[in-house]
Amino acid sequence: HIAWYAIRDLARNRWGILYTAFFLVVTAGLFYMQAQSAKVAVSLMSVCLFLIPLVSSLFGTIYFYNSREFMELVLTQPVSRRTVFLGMYLGLAAALVGGFIVGVGIPSLVMGDWSNDQLVSILMLLTIGSFLTVIFLAISFLIAIIFDDRGKGLAAALGVWLFTALVYDGLVLLGAMTFSDYPLETPMLIA
């Protein structure tokens, strides 16, 4: 029941609607400019790798802080903490993943060409975007639990996003350039 509450709450939330509309407009615009689904998937992947962790981290942290009083009220009932936490997490994850899948999936269905390779690339994009949403949402909930202060929690969420989106990639590229004389195919695939 708590997950359904979170889904209904986010269905009315303007930020959730803007998140879905953003992916609808960007995906439709990319299909309008490029006819091949594989090229659109590559372009969308770069947008998703940058934007989904940011939105999931910040939105998850803000939502957790804003729902803290509601969760305290629900915990006065005979409900376990695990049930409340999982309900809030699964509801928020379902809403964000659903918004992403609708935002990317509808233009892909309508405007995409459906050869096997291009279908696989769009499905991979949807899968990776969904996993990114779920992972960074879990990290944002952990951050909101660790930090009671909203400002510190948001700063930590932004710091985690900054590290994973920019610093980690920079360190991998620096390592690749430093050890360019050595065969790095396998370590680069792992990193």
Each language-model region and where it sits:
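A cytosolic-side transmembrane-helix exit/cap motif
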Residues: 63-68, 138-144, 172-181
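Central hydrophobic cores of alpha-helical transmembrane segments
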Residues: 20-24, 154-164
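Helix-loop-helix units of permease transmembrane domains in multi-pass membrane transporters
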Residues: 62-97
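Terminal transmembrane helical anchor/hairpin motif
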Residues: 166-191
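Transmembrane helix-loop junction
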Residues: 9, 66, 76-77, 108-112, ...
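Long, hydrophobic alpha-helical segments
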Residues: 43-67
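Secretory targeting signals
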Residues: 27-51, 91-157
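Aromatic- and glycine-rich beta-strand/loop motifs that create alpha-glucan
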Residues: 1-20
